[in-house]
Amino acid sequence: MSALALSLAMSSNHIAMAQNAVTGTPAAVAAKLMARGDAPEVVTSEMRVVRRNDILTVQSDLHNKGMTDRMVFYRYRWLDNVGNQIGDGESWKQFTLMGQGQQTLKGVAPHSNATDFRLELSFEKK
């Protein structure tokens, strides 16, 4: 098992690796993202993964390094131990990420079968 897989599987581990030179998003975090739309100034700087009461919980920090406000749509996709999606998926949530602002996104797995996740993001200029 790789160091990344171990860090994701263990409770209370932070995913913070070397910064990706292009986006500023750490490589381990970028592996968990699925993004639509163009927003190079929006960086997902850190993800915190915790298993509480056998339920996976994730917090993801987004930072808008630009001056333009962005409408952000997001949802977490929960996966089982072989990579299959669990359940029907979450509905999209939305918020405005102000220029030079930051926001923490929180997600809780629907049940204990979830062992992994992807954060899906979609961006629009406001």
Where are these regions (language model features)?
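Short beta-strand and strand-turn-strand segments in soluble, beta-rich domains
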Residues: P40-V42, D69-M71, N81-S91
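Transition segment at domain starts
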Residues: I15-I55
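Short, surface-exposed ligand- or partner-binding patches at beta-edge/loop junctions that are enriched
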Residues: S112-K126
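Intrinsically disordered, low-complexity Pro/Gly/Ser/Thr-rich segments with frequent PxxP/GP/PP motifs
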Residues: G87-N113
